[in-house]
Amino acid sequence: GFIVIPRIVHTDTGICMTGGHAWDEVEEADGPWAIRKEIRKQVRDGAEWVKILTTNRESYPELTQEELDAAVDEAHRQGVKIAVHSGTQPSIQMCIDAGFDTIEHGTFLTEAQARQMAEKGIAWTPTITAYTYLYEQTKQMIEAGVDMDNPIAARAVHDQAFFQPAFEAYRDNFKKLYDTGVTVLAGSDMVLYKAPPLPIHQELGYMVDYGITPVEAVRTATYNAASV
């Protein structure tokens, strides 16, 4: 027999600069033409979407404006859509200027930028669940006592300095950003510290906790996602 399943849109591996965010898990490419080549290879192999990664947890953008512009241009030239992992400033603005189809995380997105995204048709996938998990996990590790000779514990101390303000940014700003009219998408992300699977309904629950209605939250995982 047959069963009905969700429509699955295929992406290939992400693309970052040499030594960039998740470099050991994605493809590295430097310069506009290397990025264009990697996108062409992925489209050749069946990718329907492309993902670029351009921030880690620092304030500097990893890819240049020229590289971001080239990535968007090539993906759209090839007839596919393109997402970008970007959480900090000024990278978020650079990605808006480049014209990506979605911004993943957008952790420190401003209201003015969200309005720009709404005007340009750029969607936002906040991934609240991932950052909440990472904040809570690193907080628990620190409260349990940190052995700085343990590299995982030492990393938790370093990461907590980012994950706490990230958690607070989502909690304090999500509803204001949603109200700008930017298209919001539900997403879970893959995270660190041996995280369990992060179900979409948990993401929708945080959205409701932070101020939108249950129907609006469900829409982020259904109609909004299908329309992008």
Residue ranges and their predicted role:
Residues 89-97:
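Catalytic cores of alpha/beta
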Residues 1-81, 113-153:
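Divalent-metal coordination cores built from histidine and acidic residues
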Residues 77, 155, 166-228:
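His/Asp/Glu-enriched, well-ordered alpha-helical/loop segment
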Residues 8, 46, 50, 75, ...:
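Divalent metal-coordination and catalytic microenvironments
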Residues 96-102, 118-124, 181-182:
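Glycine-enriched alpha-helix->loop->beta-strand junction motifs that scaffold or abut catalytic
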Residues 12-13, 52-54, 84-88, 105-107, ...:
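A cross-domain feature marking catalytic cores of carbohydrate-active enzymes
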Residues 4, 100-108, 124-126:
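Short hydrophobic/aromatic-enriched beta-strand-loop microsegments
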